Amino acid sequence: MEKPLRIGIIAGELSGDTLGEGFIKAVKERYPNAEFVGIGGPKMIAQGCESLFDMEELAVMGLVEVLGRLPRLLKVKAELVKYFTQNPPDVFVGIDAPDFNLRLELDLKQAGIKTVHYVSPSVWAWRQKRIFKIEAATNLVLAFLPFEKAFYDKFNVPCEFIGHTLADAIPLQSEQAPARDLLGLEQDKKWLAVLPGSRGSELKMLSQPFIETCKLLHQKYPGLGFVVALVNQKRREQFEQAWKEHAPELDFKLVDDTARNVITASDAVMLASGTVALECMLLKRPMVVGYRVNTFTAFLAKRLLKTKYVSLPNILADDELVKEYLQDDCTPDNLFNEVSRLLESDNKPMLDKFTEMHHWIRKDADQQAANAVLKLIEK
């Protein structure tokens, strides 16, 4: 009797748990008895993945936090190396969490285990020399976006473009009215979605310019509604504080809901750069990007960033489809002028291009990831 396929797999945070779940399902369609072991969250565990450690162990952000947890992280890594070298899987798949996974993948690859890194780190954008570390640690990288594969190809590093799971999850057309009902927003007025980011540092920098932009918009369009998506109670309190300070007279509808519903319900979107810009593109809503970071980070970014643009829709199109106001340009006046333009125009060229790009990256990523990994095992 043939022994079942064994796949080592590690996800370091919730987004990785979702990717792992889809990947496991797709592999099991072809190999129902396949075994998965490593570190996963609730979704992967529900698919039958055996988790050797709690995923929370890896979900640390920020330099100070990581340093505090370093001894524990090193111990977990050492135990995983020992486990996988004593019980070698047919392949190891590290999902995202590059700081942890790439180091582990390097050790496993040196021990003769095939390794895959799922979700390319942003090497194309900054610290491009990391590509040599990635090459040393992996047999294959799975990339969400076509320009990522083009970058790896330039360095002859094996990479497969699998499409983006968000492009699979979001329908080609998204209905505004049901989203408004869901959020309790009036149907007969225009709404601007205000998305000041999900991290404390982002809200600290962006709440004030975004709120002051809304102040200017309210003077010009008294009937315009403002709906704000906030990821948790901490971010809500942070935004409320800024609201009280800068524009207590304005009426913001605060929503503890995903950005996706808030974007879908809106007529235009003012957002912090990040994955949310890609989501907004896939939902076909006109947007403007505003972003500020502290002076030191800005200084580093200027020297290190290798891309013309910061938002994914522009990087993907290699064109300024979406206005980006960064640092000193991220002012209420600039944002106000662009939001006004978006509200008064039909934005057809922008939205048509969004639809075209949705098709580019909609490839059934779960299935593509499974195919690429299984092909590597069979090599």
Swiss-Prot record:
Reactions catalysed according to its record: a lipid X + a UDP-2-N,3-O-bis[(3R)-3-hydroxyacyl]-alpha-D-glucosamine = a lipid A disaccharide + UDP + H(+)
Lipid metabolism as UniProt keyword: yes
A Gene Ontology biological process term: lipid A biosynthetic process
InterPro entries for the chain: Glyco_trans_19
Record organism: Vibrio parahaemolyticus serotype O3:K6 (strain RIMD 2210633)
Keyword terms of this UniProt record: Glycosyltransferase, Lipid A biosynthesis, Lipid biosynthesis, Lipid metabolism, Transferase
A cellular component annotation (GO) from this entry: membrane
Chain coiled-coil ranges: none
Protein name (Swiss-Prot/TrEMBL): Lipid-A-disaccharide synthase
Key word DNA damage present: no
Superkingdom per UniProt: Bacteria
Role according to the record: Condensation of UDP-2,3-diacylglucosamine and 2,3-diacylglucosamine-1-phosphate to form lipid A disaccharide, a precursor of lipid A, a phosphorylated glycolipid that anchors the lipopolysaccharide to the outer membrane of the cell.
Entry GO MF terms: lipid-A-disaccharide synthase activity; phospholipid binding
Entry similarity comment: Belongs to the LpxB family.
Pathway: Bacterial outer membrane biogenesis; LPS lipid A biosynthesis
EC number: 2.4.1.182
NCBIfam families: lpxB (TIGR00215)
